[in-house]
Design a protein with these regions (language model features):
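Proteolytic maturation boundary segments
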Residues: 1-18, 210-247, 402-422
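M16 family metallopeptidases and their MPP-like homologs
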Residues: 15-17, 23-43, 60-116, 152-175, ...
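His/Glu-based metal-binding/catalytic segments typifying zinc-dependent metallopeptidases
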Residues: 16-42, 193, 200, 219, ...
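Active-site SXXK
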Residues: 43-51
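Acidic/histidine-enriched alpha-helical segments
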Residues: 64-65, 120-144, 230-240, 333, ...
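Hydrophobic alpha-helical hairpins/lids featuring a short glycine-rich hinge
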Residues: 92, 100-149
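Hydrophobic side chains in well-ordered alpha-helices
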Residues: 110, 191, 214-217, 272, ...
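Non-catalytic, conformational "gating/processing" segments within enzyme and secreted inhibitor domains
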Residues: 185-221
């Protein structure tokens, strides 16, 4: 599949992937804006409110009926964080023209409906309906609270909040509970007008329709959107290493400790760092899993994640409170083993295979392709999955070791039980 990216209007770009192997087409529209603590919650709430109805289809029942008429098409709202960019919008999925009864064309009516959801939402006196705002605000607060209920997710979020305190990357895609609870309809509508007027709009299409049809359908569907004084898509800034390791402990009513460790990466060798992280803790054959969890039984789980947009690696683990120091020391010991090249051939080849397979499967799913290219756009990269896989296949062990030698501990976060000894 050969990707193309076309400017349709000021601040409006279309990424198109022609494909005939799927029975559906996918159409996505995403507003790209800097993520900030002050605006994240309102912008996260916005697409849920927009999805409640348009002036022509003023409630979810009417919208659902129209989607049913389009052979069960779907329009779902999305809230994502890519690098230091908050991406809010919609993804539509519908039967590809090649598979509709009589070859009926669905691209144009689906694009038109998507344009109504974005540009002509149901309003009263120039504001969103209060009942829609209230209902979706409750859902947003519940989503934020659900992170707290899953202590693994909560600890991962708290590590990023502490490591990237004062930086956009430390802000949750949903914002914080206090801000979300206090949101008013006026604030949500202000967020709407702000995004319409200044946020870049990234469109994505994957299906069999020609470029001319896709562009014409989207131009017609979005013709009523205001002219944009567009901000640039924010590019993530690499995290600057601290002179001293930051250590944070939270006390909570938990029975299992959560140890998180954040590391800075001083190298920009992306392929080498991807391989190094996979060897360290990015797969079920990685050193953290095989040694810290399986061999030494110091963790219930242990894994690492390379945040390429930010140039950091984070470790997530669940431990007994009394095993904090042992797990902490062993995690660093396993990192040093990778840095020193203490790896078997099967580990290297296993890591290559894991990453190459992951890149290969992106092309098997339209939603994965959309998510991948949204991330590439948000971070200013244009590498294809195939190019990334080739980079992994050809990176030498020496490059991996050298890149991983630049990885250093920055932040330690520990969630433990109240009154528990460490």
């Amino acid at each position: 599949m050969e990707k193309t990216r076309t400017k349709l209007a000021e601040g409006v770009y279309l990424t198109r992937l022609p494909a005939r192997k799927f029975k559906t087409s996918l159409l996505s529209a995403q507003f790209m804006t800097p993520i900030a603590a002050e605006t994240a919650a309102a912008q996260a709430l916005l697409p849920a409110v927009l999805r409640r109805g348009t002036m022509r289809y003023p409630d979810m029942g009417a919208l659902s009926t129209r989607l049913d008429e389009l052979y069960g098409a779907e329009i779902d709202y999305t809230v994502r964080k890519k690098g230091e960019c908050q991406c809010v919008g919609f993804v539509a999925s519908f039967i590809d023209d090649a598979f509709t009864p009589g070859g009926e064309k669905l691209l144009e009516p689906v694009a038109e409906l998507l344009g109504q959801v974005i540009g002509n939402p149901v309003t009263k006196d120039g504001r969103f309906l209060p009942e829609y705002v209230d209902s979706e605000r409750t859902n947003l607060v519940d989503a934020i609270r659900s992170i707290l209920n899953d202590k693994r997710d909560y600890a991962d979020l708290r590590l990023l909040q502490e490591m990237c305190a004062g930086e956009p990357y430390g802000v949750s895609r949903f914002g914080d509970e206090k801000t979300a609870q206090a949101l008013t309809g006026e604030q949500v509508y202000e967020a709407y007008t702000r995004l319409l007027s200044s946020a870049p709009l990234e469109l994505f299409y994957c299906g069999s329709a020609s470029a001319e049809r896709v562009e014409a359908a989207l131009m017609a569907a979005l013709s009523n959107l205001p002219h944009k004084a567009v901000q640039a898509i924010p590019q993530s800034q690499c995290h600057t290493a601290r002179k001293e390791v930051k250590r944070v402990t939270d006390l909570m009513d938990v029975t299992q400790g959560k140890l998180g460790m954040g590391f800075t990466c001083g190298s920009d060798d992306f392929s080498a760092l991807m391989m190094g992280n996979t060897l360290f803790g990015g797969s079920s054959n990685a050193k953290l899993f095989m040694n810290v969890r399986e061999k030494l039984s110091l963790c219930y789980y242990a894994s690492s994640l390379f945040h390429r947009q930010k140039g950091i690696i984070t470790v997530s683990s669940g431990i007994e409170f009394q095993n904090f120091q042992k797990a902490y020391d062993e995690i660093q010991h396993q990192l040093k083993a990778v840095q020193d090249g203490k790896l078997e051939d099967w580990e290297l080849e296993g890591a290559r295979s894991t990453l190459c397979n992951a890149y290969a499967t992106i092309g098997d799913s339209q939603s994965k392709l959309e998510n991948f290219w949204l991330g590439q756009t948000a971070t200013g990269r244009d590498d294809t999955p195939e190019a990334l896989a080739e980079g992994v296949r050809t990176v030498s062990p020496e490059r991996i070791y050298e890149a991983m030698k630049t990885v250093s501990l920055d932040t330690v976060y520990f969630l433990k039980g109240e009154g528990a000894e460490q």
